[in-house]
């Protein structure tokens, strides 16, 4: 008698090559930006710290870390059913996010090479790290008889345009929250090795230090641009920066960057990153259960640590202890579960509309929770 392992069905581009997950508001995004503005960025105010970070990047502490050992050389058919599906999704999302970082950093290094060589080399070395991470994750997917065609992703994924300032806010938070996600899982599994279902988790301690160093780089760049943080433009600086063209794109940038206080953007990106992670992880709570983690407790710890870390550079942080903070996020979790059920039943947009509007309302109310002044202490 032959045992058939319960394996989830995934759409494939061709045998063994998984079709990319459908793009939604919660999936990892690919970014592009104003490369000319990046090249013209003045970093003299914090150049010494950036040069020190560049020296760290050059050391390449993890050059020999991402090497698969004999523990990978086995069948993984015992990871089956829902756990297998969720783990493959975890690997895919992680690989896509790392590859997105590689593409952005590589393009920035190429565009800035002759104009801003210090930043260009930093971006080049960060792209090296991101490529290494993405490749390691894609090889892990292959252990489950699937992998991503990263060239296909490059050509067919839609790219989201962000102003340079927004790139720095978003990537800083992405790297720092990545650090806290990886180190929290690693520390948990060190205490509970019986839940280490796959050897990739053994690599998370050193891996997360790449994320931490990348976050420190973006921290240093923002400190070199204090108008992004706690030194908003003066009225006369705003007048001087009025666009001398009728370009709608330039005028949109002018109003968003010059007239919206940086504290509001910091709050917006903190909330966006935290809400996205919370909604994604609660959709996949069974994956964290397989690791011996409670998804809610895990996310709340990661959010608290990332929020505290962000306070080292951002002028404000979120009040994640406010009683409404998680109440409203939970309402969004409930709404998303209902949206998933409607989609399974091929329900139309009108059925989904009240839930979409409810999610928007919850986000508005979350944004309006008064922010907190950060305590400037290092987080370990």
UniProtKB/Swiss-Prot annotation:
HAMAP family found in the cross-reference section: AcsF
Keyword Iron-sulfur recorded: no
EC number: 1.14.13.81
The protein, known as: Magnesium-protoporphyrin IX monomethyl ester [oxidative] cyclase 1
Pathway entry: Porphyrin-containing compound metabolism; chlorophyll biosynthesis (light-independent)
Named cofactor requirement(s): Fe cation
Key words, A-Z: Chlorophyll biosynthesis, Iron, Metal-binding, NADP, Oxidoreductase, Photosynthesis
Thylakoid listed as a keyword: no
Organism, scientific name: Thermosynechococcus vestitus (strain NIES-2133 / IAM M-273 / BP-1)
Reported function: Catalyzes the formation of the isocyclic ring in chlorophyll biosynthesis. Mediates the cyclase reaction, which results in the formation of divinylprotochlorophyllide (Pchlide) characteristic of all chlorophylls from magnesium-protoporphyrin IX 13-monomethyl ester (MgPMME).
GO biological process, one term: light-independent chlorophyll biosynthetic process
GO terms for MF: iron ion binding; magnesium-protoporphyrin IX monomethyl ester (oxidative) cyclase activity
Name of the coding gene: acsF1
Enzyme class: oxidoreductase
Family according to the record: Belongs to the AcsF family.
UniProt catalytic activity: Mg-protoporphyrin IX 13-monomethyl ester + 3 NADPH + 3 O2 + 2 H(+) = 3,8-divinyl protochlorophyllide a + 3 NADP(+) + 5 H2O
